[in-house]
């Protein structure tokens, strides 16, 4: 099997413009971890592998065992991607959901009839939209944070804001952990925290209304911010580990400062949630990250990321599990997920990195 790996940020997706620093750092981490996983697996299976690299990243990634295709400024990165896909059997894209980037890559692979080693374009379209994800979660009675589309919301006078407050009460979320008169606004298709804002005053709402783009608004709920690293296939989910996310709040925005992979060794309280998500989102396939916020009342689903997340970087060291090996197993059957160790691994993030 010949596999193409394309991490959008470090692989040439920004070859005609400056690399976004935060996304570049995260992309390098995930790309290196994936190449390391695949390299180990190639020692056992008959695999040949190619990777696309931005000309500014070439030499900064260990690509031993991979055919490296350098993308220069004069290249059309999408055309190069399509041409390389035609030469491969399977493709593993890593890309942000914003502007439909990941969805378009997945659709290209599917159109060319190649094996996609991630969730299909249909799953990316759904989970890449925070409001549609919220609606699907509500439809399947999975606890989530009440959300509305942000459309010219007026401070404390808008029916949608009042409806959010009422939904909090109806959902059984207690006042513990809820910031009165604080709201969180997020880009509908944004990645991480880069386009999310905490609103605390009428002036904040006025400023937010002047921004371009589509946003959702949610009550600002305080709690333990965790994530799940999972595998999914056709309505079945496998939980790999839980992760703890530590944030700083700078200029009314959350910024991920530290990530503890496999922080909670007891996975029992999350197993039913993973099974419910698998049933609610049967489109999901392969590695998926699920962002949560845990309050004294319940565990709430914040987002579903149909791609590799930063937590993936620490899984091999934390559990000895080769995620790439298990994703390849999904192509023909079920993953083994055999762990050889069980420890927490801390990843310190540079300022502005996201998950």
Please place each PLM-identified region on the residue numbering.
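Flexible, glycine/charged-enriched surface loops at secondary-structure junctions
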Residues: 285-291, 337-342
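Extreme N-terminal starter segment of soluble prokaryotic enzymes
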Residues: 1-4
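Conserved N-proximal alpha/beta basic substrate-recognition cap immediately N-terminal to
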Residues: 48-159, 163-166, 171, 175
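Short catalytic helix/loop segments, enriched in acidic residues and glycine
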Residues: 19-38
